[in-house]
Amino acid sequence: MAKVRKAPAGDFIKFLGTAGARFVMIEQLRASGGIWIAFAGTNVLVDPGPGSIVRCAASRPRLDPGKLDAIILTHRHLDHANDINVMIEGMTEGGFKKRGVVFCPGDAICDDSVILRHAAALPERIEILEANKRYIVKDFTFETSMRHIHPAETYGLKFSIGGTSVSLISDTKYFLELSSFYKADILILPVVFFEPRPGVDHLCLDDARNIIRQIRPKKAILTHFGMTMLKSKPHIQAQGLTRELGIEVVAASDGMTVGF
């Protein structure tokens, strides 16, 4: 079973931020730096939002962007992609080493690209994410989900890391097929709203409850909190879900590390 650690050591998932929705991000009530995954010497950064480079520098021990092997964007929205260019600079050691891979949906590098032309030339390659495809990053693989229901082209991720499966749901409106794809040992869910918000393509706490109940992972981690979730105290809500579902549910905090 996964365990929470205070600092990275060996193989881990580290939350460089847990902000969801624009006002939590803008006011930095929670950090918005994305998620760093490390396994067997391979390092991947998912969704480097605003302040990702700062959160790497502030981590203890410090996370070195020059050790990254890949950066993945689940979609182009600012809370997920704002720091993509500076993190590409970091991964390539200021552009002096052509290394690393960037994975992103096609609309992230369209005419209104979130990746600057200069930065796009720095990594070894940019791979376009498509629905239900498998990708390899050195020592582990990941799959993309079906396209999510969200204004931007958005895909979630399922990682096979050693003997552990980790699913990361990205922003989406709830739909039934989510539970069939995201079955995993560790399930990470973005819970923007405390209560349903019709017409807005994000998950609420009831959606998270339904998904966790259907998948029954060994551990579920709530993150990407909006204002209503913060006011409702995510750790209290996670404790309630643990009691209700009989599954370990944790509310992520900025800097939290989960070891394998």
Can you name each region flagged by the protein language model?
Residues 2-6, 97-154, 161-162, 255:
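Metallo-beta-lactamase
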Residues 2-60, 153-170, 186:
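Conserved beta-strand hairpin/beta-sheet module of binuclear metal-dependent hydrolase folds
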Residues 45-49, 68-79, 104-105, 166-172, ...:
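Active-site neighborhood of phospho(di)ester-bond hydrolases with catalytic His/Asp-centered motifs
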Residues 50-51, 108, 148-151, 170-175:
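Short beta->alpha connector loops
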Residues 51-101, 184-186:
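Active-site metal-binding motif and surrounding structural segment of the metallo-beta-lactamase
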Residues 82-91, 114-115, 230-239:
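Metal-dependent catalytic neighborhoods of phosphoester/phosphodiester hydrolases
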Residues 174-259:
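Cap/insert and terminal regions of metallo-dependent hydrolase folds
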